[in-house]
């Protein structure tokens, strides 16, 4: 399985999928994950059937980010068919450089890397190359994401505000200003995706322990709020009408 970067807005299922299927995890060579993975250097590739998947190091949204260029070898061994851009290039936007700024690198440095990744790598692909990003509208990883799920390099070159002709400094100034505040859990999720941690199955088994009525009343007396998360239909079926 391929991870383009360490997502910040959700905990990925790569460790669980690896545990259940034995599938190996592929990450950018600079990922530095604590679990075993196949490091993908720039332009390294993996072939399966008629498909060749080549890695491009595209840091900027995150330091370790990669994009995956897909070749349909039944059509051409040298002309890209599509590219999975992760959170580097969205439809209508590019990835925020501030979410993963950490010790040793800041949002300005990541924004500079993002500009270089876009202009020196992704925009060098043919205009007809299909673009499949990791997110659509609604994600906090960008501020102008489209509801569309696929585009082309050519369409993004002409329509994406962040890809219009400008200097690197102009791009950095634009992309580092006016970003909405990121939720506090983003940094936690990103760290979790980089390290070995209990799977969802293990977490649920350890966490979902039933409470007795007396325990609930005790918690309530100390300020705990009980939230009923049942579906309205289930609630109605269980409700005792007096």
Predicted stretch roles:
Residues 1-26:
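Active-site metal-binding motif and surrounding structural segment of the metallo-beta-lactamase
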Residues 5, 17, 58-61, 87, ...:
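Divalent metal-coordination and catalytic microenvironments
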Residues 6, 30-31, 62, 88, ...:
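Active-site metal-binding loops of divalent metal-dependent hydrolases
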Residues 37-128, 140-144:
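Catalytic core of the metallo-beta-lactamase
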Residues 58, 224-230, 235:
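Short hydrophobic beta-strand that contains or immediately precedes a catalytic carboxylate
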Residues 75-83, 104-105, 109-203:
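Divalent-metal (often Zn2+) His-rich catalytic cores of metallo-beta-lactamase-fold enzymes
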Residues 205-219:
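A short, well-structured juxtamembrane/interface segment
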Residues 240-242:
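Conserved small/polar residues in nucleotide/adenosyl-binding loops
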């Amino acid at each position: 399985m391929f991870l383009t970067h360490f997502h910040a807005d959700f905990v990925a299922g790569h460790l669980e999928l690896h545990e259940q299927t034995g599938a190996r995890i592929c990450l950018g060579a600079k990922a530095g994950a604590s679990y075993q993975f196949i490091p993908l250097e720039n332009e390294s590739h993996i072939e399966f059937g008629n498909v060749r998947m080549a890695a491009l190091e595209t840091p900027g949204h995150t330091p370790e980010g990669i994009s995956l260029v897909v070749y349909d070898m039944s059509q051409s061994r040298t002309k890209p068919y599509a590219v999975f851009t992760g959170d580097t290039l969205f439809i209508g936007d590019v990835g925020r450089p501030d979410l993963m700024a950490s010790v040793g690198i800041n949002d300005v440095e990541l924004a500079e890397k993002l500009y270089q990744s876009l202009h020196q790598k992704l925009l060098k692909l043919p205009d007809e190359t299909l673009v499949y990003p990791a997110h659509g509208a609604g994600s906090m990883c960008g501020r102008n994401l489209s509801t569309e799920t696929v585009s082309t390099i050519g369409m993004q070159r002409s329509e994406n505000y962040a890809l219009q002709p400008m200097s690197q400094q102009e791009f950095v100034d634009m992309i580092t200003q006016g970003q909405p505040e990121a939720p506090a859990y983003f940094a936690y999720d990103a760290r979790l995706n980089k390290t070995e941690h209990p799977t969802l199955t293990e977490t649920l088994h350890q966490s979902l322990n039933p409470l007795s009525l007396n325990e609930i009343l005790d918690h309530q007396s100390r300020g705990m709020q009980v939230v009923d998360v049942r579906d309205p239909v289930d609630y109605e079926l269980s409700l005792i009408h007096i």
